[in-house]
Amino acid sequence: MRVQILDLPSFGYHFITQTHIPRGKDEYYLRFSQSAEPPRAWRPLSKEEIHTLIQKGNHCDTWHDVLVADPFDASLIRNSSFAGLVRIASLERRLLRYHDFTVPTGITHSTLISCDVGENCAIHHCAYISHYIIGNHVILSRIDELCTTNHAKFGAGIIKDGEQEAVRITIDPLNETGGRKIFPFVGMIAADAFLWACHRDRTLLMQRFESMTQQQHDTRRGYYGTIETQSVIKSCRIIKDVCFGPGSYVKGANKLKNLTVQSSLQEPTQIGEGVELVNGVIGYGCRVFYGVKAVRFVLGNNCALKYGTRLIHSVLGDNSTISCCEVLNALIFPYHEQHHNNSFLIAALIRGQSNIAAGSTIGSNHNTRKNDGEIIAGRGFWSGLASTLKHNCRFASFVLITGKNYPAELDIPFPFSLVTNNERENRLEIMPAYYWLYNMYAIERNEKKFAARDKRKTKTQTVEISVFAPDTIGEIENALALLDSAIERAWVNAGNSALTAEDIVLKHPTKAQTIPVLLTGIEHSTRSTLVLKPLEARKAYRDILIWYCTKTLLSFFEQTTRCISHFTSHDPKTITHNWVNMGGQLVPEDKFETLLQNIETGKFKSWHHIHKEYDALAATYETDKALHAYAVLCSLARTRIDAPLLCTYVQHAITIEKYRVTQIHKTRCKDYLNPFREITYRNPLERNAVLGTPEEDQLIRTTEEESAHLCALYARYIAPPHLG
């Protein structure tokens, strides 16, 4: 585009071309409709005020198009220029302070073009402000360029009247080729992106999502950018086509373009030094600081991007933090952590509560003829230091990858497992139920830390943070079946007569311990995959199922005053065992399918209606979860659960709960029994002063209190009359 030469009288006018102005309207009709406040009594400047303004070094070719509202002190405007229709609300001699930054109200050394300015604002050294509606008590200081175009989308993936499809901004999560593209919109959450990106085979569903997104935003040209009340923007270079919510704080940003910054006085969003953000939607209460580069992205509420993060073509769920690293083409559910500057995450679906360690390279994009690989990981995925994974891989929930190079694709169906590449023996090794067996403290800490980190005031969706929940329980059921098959196969391959896994464990436990259990279909290679401690893992999985199901049922009975007879009318075989992690919210698979069908048939007309349905699904979650626990326990018992049988399982669960609490304490104590942990301290007293003792550990104390309550609950329901 070439530099254009304009006539002076047209400067500041004709924001919307005549072809896009409806009959009977003018170029300001949308601008006037954007103000949420009661109409002000705008008036023209008096001759005395114009004289004062000129004396103060101000310039305007059309002073009659500068309107003000009383009280108005013209002496507070100095060395500034105005063009087009400029409206300035009441302006009095005041000071505005934000933290330690204090400035006087007024407009100095600035240029305003067709803008509305709210009450008692401070605008200083802003070289170019064009087509913005500025709220009350806003501070704008030392901004090079702040402008809005007539076709601004403010981060939404829509096209305006008269535009071609080619200009639409899309995001390509999970796959770099664009085959899973979605249209971002204000209010989008990880669940929306999941529905859209992960069901591409449903053509009608895709069409509904596209039309809903396009219809959610007004396609008319001429909307102004907004900087809402109590916002502070200072020392920035270029800001173009950005809407800022109330209480936004921006300092030292290099470039902000085509964004919506959602913010409120209760959940202010902050953007800091050296940041460059283009084509995105930022949630409430976010912090984006120190050299972050993000392009084509959606941030959930209470997210943080820091220290040079590169986030491109990605959707990040609520309560997540990414620092220093590179994340491309990723769909990440809530509570993700990635802190180190030498990790990257490429083309992946991470289902939240996850952690990518230093040196982790998740996704080698060049192991196929095209950059079309994908990685899918369940909740709680944790890649160890310097681990390397290649596309395509799939992981169950709470899988810990040790720091190794994994040369082939992986499909790990065992939740709570430890995976390692044994290079000496040239084999992959998996320890199912590792966390339950050897790191119970980490399981408990996970749940507690996520609850503590949830600072959201705006909660669009109910997110499950409990480690043991319907999704992980379903994975345990599937893993248990695979483990049983592997044990039975190993038993026969060792020259024994065929037996069920249960009989092998009960009748030949010692002999079974000596037989290696191998798996197939886990790694895309010719080498073997060995299961570590398969019998212990089998028992652990069964204990988890019993403990979880009894705990869930009895908690439900306590909350609702219902009993086991409430479920006996249900055929457990008709209750779905499979649940879907829908952006952090857990939904039974059959209800999830109904949701998709209702969207396809047009029952839900907008994303707002879909979000309401998320709430409706959340409202039945506790009942659905209890029903699921009943079905799982019936499957485990191979019969319907009645009051006496439930009593038996409750007695077993008491033993498991005591083991669980003991293991939490025991796994924490390991840190104190390790002699190498002592070498940086002069004596145990210094160590305890720094770290505290296991007995003082708040997590352990809280867990013991919760366990006492649970055991008391179990005790109350031991007698069959209470269960029936």
UniProtKB/Swiss-Prot annotation:
Pfam families: DUF4954 (PF16314), DUF6819 (PF20683). Disulfide bonds: none annotated. SUPFAM superfamilies: Trimeric LpxA-like enzymes. InterPro entries: DUF4954, DUF6819, Trimer_LpxA-like_sf. This is Uncharacterized protein TP_0851. It comes from Treponema pallidum (strain Nichols).
